Amino acid sequence: QLAPLGGAVLLDGRSLTDYTGPARARKLALMLPHTRRTELTSCFEFAAAGRIPYTGRLGILSDTDRQAVRDALELVGASPLAGRDFNCISDGQRQRVLLARAICQQPGVLLLDEPTSFLDVKGKIELLTILQKLAHEQGLAVIVSLHELDMAQKIADAVVCVFPHSVSGALTPKEAFAPENIRALYSLTKEQYEA
């Protein structure tokens, strides 16, 4: 966990550092584009690791936990992968299983760094649609870091732009993707932008 350079990160009005590991994991899930390889772990078992905040370190799954894993794999379209070795699936399939693991945590906040990495266009749209559904139908706060502006524009309810020396406030997609903002974000001249 990185310490903030300034200020504090609050979750439900409390400093993030006030939460113990399991309590934090029940509130906040993180999906990174790369993960450690595991030996002889099925996709079901890998996704089930998201239940550890509820099962404890021994990871003994109850029937409720197993159902949560099945539901998460189904939601991301990875049910057929459940019995396959996590190391023997494609990068795109791995992204789906990583998302299922995060969903298994049943967090209130889901942070994703470049979740569409390694996915083809169809896979990107499917994954982003799942994230949008989680936000709109389940009330999950979904925060996504993307460099693909076209994808962000399709799904975002709010956009925060990271400039070389500053960060914008929350913008509507219309504001964020206005030509003048894109030019400023990428330090483009009008001619470069319109080329």
Where do the language-model regions lie?
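H-loop/switch region of ABC-family ATPase nucleotide-binding domains
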Residues: 146-147
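H-loop (His-switch) and adjacent beta-strand-loop-beta switch element
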Residues: 159-172
